Amino acid sequence: MARRRRAQTRKIDADPVYGSVVISKFINKLMYDGKKSKAENIFYKAMDLVKEKTGKDGLEAFNEAIENIKPRVEVKSRRVGGSTYQVPVDVRPDRQNSLAFTWLIDASRKRGGRSMIERLSNEIVDAIDGKGQAVAKRDTVHRMAEGNKAFAHFRW
């Protein structure tokens, strides 16, 4: 059923340590079973490890990693005359962040390591350096869009 208008976005408070709404959204995405304090604990300890490894401020390092993971374009399926085409479309800024968070968390969870704190910090450091699974996922999405550039005129 189509909506008459776009769903309203909830206002999310900034996190207490860095004062950033982006980090607050990331912590919410990281959270399992409503255990926010555990998610915050994992994130802040991972940021401490990132600070040790890179020497950069936690907020600065996190923002740089997210910028390197954000997709600029993605493909969406569009059915035209019995055929389905993968049409490249630009990604909205809020969706860019959402996808970057999801990819970073998924890559961290799949990564080998002792604790989620270490895995998350290692993935963030790799993302800053332009490598790691999350950046590879972004590159895959960009390659798909590049390969289907011929269908860009089907954009809606």
From Swiss-Prot:
Pfam families: Ribosomal_S7
Any one Gene Ontology molecular-function term assigned to this protein's record: rRNA binding
GO annotation terms (biological process): translation
InterPro entries linked: Ribosomal_uS7, Ribosomal_uS7_bac/org-type, Ribosomal_uS7_CS, Ribosomal_uS7_dom, Ribosomal_uS7_dom_sf
Entry keyword Ribosomal protein: yes
Keywords attached to this entry: Ribonucleoprotein, Ribosomal protein, RNA-binding, rRNA-binding, tRNA-binding
TM spans (from-to): none
A GO CC term assigned to this protein in UniProt: small ribosomal subunit
Keyword Ribonucleoprotein: yes
Alphabetized SUPFAM superfamilies for the sequence: Ribosomal protein S7 (SSF47973)
Function as written in the Swiss-Prot or TrEMBL entry: One of the primary rRNA binding proteins, it binds directly to 16S rRNA where it nucleates assembly of the head domain of the 30S subunit. Is located at the subunit interface close to the decoding center, probably blocks exit of the E-site tRNA.
Subunit structure: Part of the 30S ribosomal subunit. Contacts proteins S9 and S11.
Family indicated by similarity: Belongs to the universal ribosomal protein uS7 family.
Name this polypeptide is given: Small ribosomal subunit protein uS7
Species per Swiss-Prot/TrEMBL record: Brachyspira hyodysenteriae (strain ATCC 49526 / WA1)
